[in-house]
From Swiss-Prot:
This is Modulator protein MzrA. Belongs to the MzrA family. The chain crosses the membrane at residues 11-31. Residues 1-10 are cytoplasmic. The gene is mzrA. InterPro entries: Modulator_MzrA, SecD-TM. It is found in: Cell inner membrane. Keywords: Cell inner membrane, Cell membrane, Membrane, Transmembrane, Transmembrane helix. Modulates the activity of the EnvZ/OmpR two-component regulatory system, probably by directly modulating EnvZ enzymatic activity and increasing stability of phosphorylated OmpR. One of its GO terms (cellular component) is plasma membrane. It comes from Pantoea sp. (strain At-9b). GO terms for molecular function: protein kinase binding. The lineage of its organism: Bacteria, Pseudomonadati, Pseudomonadota, Gammaproteobacteria, Enterobacterales.
Amino acid sequence: MKILTRIPRRLLPWLLGGALALVAVSFAPALLSHETVVQIRVANSGTPLPDGFYLYQQLSAQGVRIKSITPSGDALVIHFENEEQSLAAQKVLRRLLPQGFVVAAGHQASQQNQDANRSIYS
């Protein structure tokens, strides 16, 4: 409490405001992240995953903008900037991939493996 008595009262609101601003700035990137994810998994064991570069080419040819494609264990995780791109990619992938693949959508799917993986294409 000695520190608070040494600080002039007129500076106290500015210091508290600055501290709140620092907290807000540190949490802003997490709150503003609207990245969506589509995950492609194999339905039957023994079937290899599709080639990430092939998927990138096919989605790009259909006008879908991909942020990155990342392997995640037994799945490929495709990151998109917004929900519209994700929905368009799901439609294309369901037409493009044969029956043995599962296309699942979600916000930040497979978050636990995201840091351990490297981006293949971005």
